[in-house]
Amino acid sequence: MTSIRIGNGYDIHQLVEGRPLILGGVQIEHSLGLKGHSDADVLTHAIMDALLGALSLGDIGHYFPPTDPKWAGADSLKLLEQVHQLILDRGWQIGNIDSVVVAERPKLKPHIEAMRDRISQVLNLSPELIGIKATTNEKLGPVGQEQGICSYAVALLTSDS
């Protein structure tokens, strides 16, 4: 009998000057970047939290605390590799991931395919199992006022054991 688990994740980071904007492992040209201890890739962080949550393994702050200097400037795709290994070590496989990035600017649609490709390579999944959408917050709240970018993700895990 196949078992399934579903997890959801969320992340938000402030937009600031002097930092690159990295989403889904892709550097995107923009005048502002996301502030954070690592590369502040909100999409990848939300995906990691969804994967961890599906197995009740806590959140990324437990595994990669922002107070630990060894994670300063970390490439979030490298962290995603480690989270994926935790999932595999417990006998689970990723069924699919669906996500949305919320940002007023820049327009993200031209970058979605590259983000999907990067994430699918790290997770060794077919790109059609990775859903990434982009939307705005209709100028509402801190994301709508271009103070930050956030992301939501849902992950489905399966196990035959």
Swiss-Prot record:
Q: Is Metal-binding among the key words of this record?
A: yes
Q: How does it assemble?
A: Homotrimer.
Q: Could you confirm whether the keyword Lyase appears in this record?
A: yes
What highest taxon heads this organism's lineage? Answer: Bacteria
Q: What is this protein called?
A: 2-C-methyl-D-erythritol 2,4-cyclodiphosphate synthase
The residues the record assigns to binding 4-CDP-2-C-methyl-D-erythritol 2-phosphate are D11, I12, H13, H37, S38, D59, I60, G61, T135, T136, N137, E138
- The main enzyme category here is lyase
* InterPro entries in UniProt: MECDP_synthase, MECDP_synthase_CS, MECDP_synthase_sf
Organism (species): Acaryochloris marina (strain MBIC 11017)
Pfam families documented for this protein:
YgbB
Q: Which PANTHER family match?
A: 2-C-METHYL-D-ERYTHRITOL 2,4-CYCLODIPHOSPHATE SYNTHASE, CHLOROPLASTIC
Q: Tell me, what does this protein do in biology?
A: Involved in the biosynthesis of isopentenyl diphosphate (IPP) and dimethylallyl diphosphate (DMAPP), two major building blocks of isoprenoid compounds. Catalyzes the conversion of 4-diphosphocytidyl-2-C-methyl-D-erythritol 2-phosphate (CDP-ME2P) to 2-C-methyl-D-erythritol 2,4-cyclodiphosphate (ME-CPP) with a corresponding release of cytidine 5-monophosphate (CMP).
Please list the GO terms describing molecular function: 2-C-methyl-D-erythritol 2,4-cyclodiphosphate synthase activity; metal ion binding
Q: Which gene encodes it?
A: ispF
EC number(s) per UniProt? 4.6.1.12
